[in-house]
Amino acid sequence: MSQVIDIVSLYPKDMNIYGDSGNVLTIQRRLALYGYEPRVHAYNQGCDWPEHVDMILGGGGQDTGQKKIIDDFFQRADLLRSLAADGVPMLMICGLYQLFGEYFETVDGTRLDGIGVIGAYTVGQNVRMIGNLVEHSDQFGDVIGYENHSGQTFLLSLIHI
């Protein structure tokens, strides 16, 4: 029998605007290829939290989606901080990335406090930033990605990748 890997997908109902479920499917597939048995727990507002968590994935949502989940999210904040401190791997994209930071300020000036797992804050802009990215890391080589967002993120401390 293969080792089970419990994956929590955070708020897939409200925070999946750009097909972030594809990240969940990709992680599931890669784990299965390496002989693991991935088990995905979709956590939405009002759901029970799973007993065991090996990894957490979170996606993007419009500002309205973030406002919709924020109360429930803060009820889970201490648990999420504790899991992060324990080294549980987490991949946060877009809106949940912003909420894992210190705060997110929308274009209209509304400030949504985050839970402070990531030492950064994000400020919404009137112009979207869209396009391919290539950054070089001494540790990982070229890191290739794609951006499509209106928020500009500022690091509070230097992070090396």
Feature roles, as predicted:
Residues 137-155:
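Conserved anion/nucleotide-ligand pocket segment
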Residues 46-51, 123-124, 154:
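A short acidic, often aromatic-flanked loop/helix-cap motif at beta-alpha or helix-coil junctions
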Residues 63-140:
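Cysteine-nucleophile active-site neighborhood
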Residues 18, 126, 156-157:
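Short helix/loop capping segments that flank catalytic or ligand/cofactor-binding pockets
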Residues 159-161:
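Conserved small/polar residues in nucleotide/adenosyl-binding loops
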Residues 7, 115, 146-148:
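A residue-level signal for conserved active-site and pocket-lining positions in enzyme catalytic cores
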Residues 1-85:
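N-terminal beta1-alpha1 cap of cysteine-dependent amidohydrolase-like domains
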Residues 11-12, 43-45, 59-61, 93-96, ...:
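Fold-independent oxyanion-binding glycine-rich loops
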